[in-house]
């Protein structure tokens, strides 16, 4: 019987497109230049869960402290990671001017993750007219924490990122941007977001090594722990800018 080359196995994805080949080729995953894996960095133990003094689960990670444009201390390695939901305040920066008239509840829900509580959903929905609700592309979900009557029918508004999605859709309308495919890196707001990251890192020529899809559907870009620390130090230092 002829042995099949693993790279020639049939795939539902057309040849040449991501996912068309068998991946990964090793159980430890592929290696890519300038992208260290979890086996390549010197993680530090941050939290140790014990049962009767015996360690059962240890969480490892990396930490960096920044002041202005300077890293003053770090440990665990300058690991490459995705900022994901912690980047919400920076993702809203391209829309500061057009959304400046939002009330504080609307601003808070735009820049944060939420539990899907009644007041959270109300704040998120208030950002859009009811006729615009159908544009929402965040995943279906149920409230994160439920008491009393249980919500069992998933809805987009219950998703932890629905406020951010609604705010970006509103901002794009006010800026005259097409909202078709608004969750894709090819959308008009995304290059503006990358410019914000360059500004807050003080790295005008920076480019992300990877752009991936976050759990809510929005793009998430790779940054080192040091880069994230610098951005959030500057976010605090410039908190009164807008």
Over which residues does each language-model region extend?
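Active-site SXXK
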Residues: 83-100, 119
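Alpha-helix capping and helix-loop boundary segments enriched in small/acidic/polar residues
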Residues: 78-83, 115
């Amino acid at each position: 019987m002829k042995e099949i080359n693993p790279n020639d196995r049939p795939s539902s994805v057309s040849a040449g497109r991501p996912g068309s080949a068998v991946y990964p080729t090793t159980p430890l995953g592929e290696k890519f230049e300038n992208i260290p894996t979890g086996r390549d960095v010197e993680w530090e133990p941050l939290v140790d869960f014990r049962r009767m003094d015996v360690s059962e689960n240890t969480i490892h990670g990396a930490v960096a402290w920044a002041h202005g444009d300077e890293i003053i201390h770090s440990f665990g390695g300058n690991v490459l990671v995705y900022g994901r939901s912690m980047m919400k305040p920076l993702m809203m920066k391209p829309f500061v001017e057009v959304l400046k008239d939002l009330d504080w509840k609307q601003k808070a829900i735009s820049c944060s993750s939420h539990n899907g509580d009644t007041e959270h959903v109300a704040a998120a929905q208030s950002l859009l007219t009811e006729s615009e609700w159908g544009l929402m592309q965040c995943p279906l979900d149920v409230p994160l924490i439920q008491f009393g009557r249980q919500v069992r029918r998933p809805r987009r508004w219950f998703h932890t990122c629905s406020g951010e999605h609604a705010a970006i859709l509103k901002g794009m309308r006010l800026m005259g941007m097409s909202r078709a495919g608004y969750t894709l890196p090819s959308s008009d707001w995304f290059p503006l977001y990358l410019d914000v990251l360059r500004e807050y890192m003080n790295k005008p020529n920076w480019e992300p090594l990877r752009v991936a899809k976050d759990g809510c559907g929005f793009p998430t870009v790779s940054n080192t722990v040091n880069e994230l620390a610098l951005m959030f130090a500057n976010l605090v230092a410039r908190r009164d800018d807008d």
